[in-house]
Amino acid sequence: MRGVSCLQVLLLLVLGAAGTQGRKSAACGQPRMSSRIVGGRDGRDGEWPWQASIQHRGAHVCGGSLIAPQWVLTAAHCFPRRALPAEYRVRLGALRLGSTSPRTLSVPVRRVLLPPDYSEDGARGDLALLQLRRPVPLSARVQPVCLPVPGARPPPGTPCRVTGWGSLRPGVPLPEWRPLQGVRVPLLDSRTCDGLYHVGADVPQAERIVLPGSLCAGYPQGHKDACQGDSGGPLTCLQSGSWVLVGVVSWGKGCALPNRPGVYTSVATYSPWIQARVSF
């Protein structure tokens, strides 16, 4: 489902049961429709209310996540160097991109902020903060996801969800009538993931392919993954009853290939940078 190489509320810090506290409000990370996605299945209305579609001149280019009423987090590589914020809009509250509804929102982007360590090859700092032209009203279909505490990361094996409107497989785009897709993927140890990417690659073992600031999720045998069009979208994990934005879809080799799990930008690594700029 990966792109080409995806009102005011008071948010409080609360302690999580396992020490994975995050920036939360009464609404963040708690959809009114409970998730039933186990692997590669259709989403339901209001199931992932933070899911955003980043659109360039009306066309979907990447996914994103609402983290505050006026802020969306996505991937930096979704924005070419000379891209103008005024050419982009963020669509929220949608289940299918091919249909319109008065319950969905389409908001212009005011500005795009990139981390200071972002590299254009996407290897580092592949995040973009989008400030919307105006705050959006929150509802059952539009809610923010929770942010992780700086440096906190769930352990390997934690089951998480990646969602998006990206391709079903390489070269097979999601039909416009199909709803938002989601798949369950476990977090992988970073060294294990880096080792998998060295399999069949002409890269010395001592040279890191998956760099610090990234994390991996998926299966060594493949089968389940993000794909073209999902870049910038959310990798969320359920922690203490709330969904937390653990990763942002960044890059991978193909889609769901063996030894090539999805690579995500670690949101916890950049939480201080995010929180210093976002008005919650």
From Swiss-Prot:
Gene3D superfamilies: Trypsin-like serine proteases (2.40.10.10). It is an enzyme of class 3 (hydrolase). It comes from the Eukaryota. InterPro entries: Peptidase_S1_PA, Peptidase_S1_PA_chymotrypsin, Peptidase_S1A, Trypsin_dom, TRYPSIN_HIS, TRYPSIN_SER. GO terms for biological process: proteolysis. Disulfide bonds join C62-C78, C160-C237, C193-C216, C227-C255. GO terms for molecular function: serine-type endopeptidase activity. PANTHER family: SERINE PROTEASE 33, TRANSMEMBRANE PROTEASE SERINE. This is Serine protease 33. The gene is PRSS33.
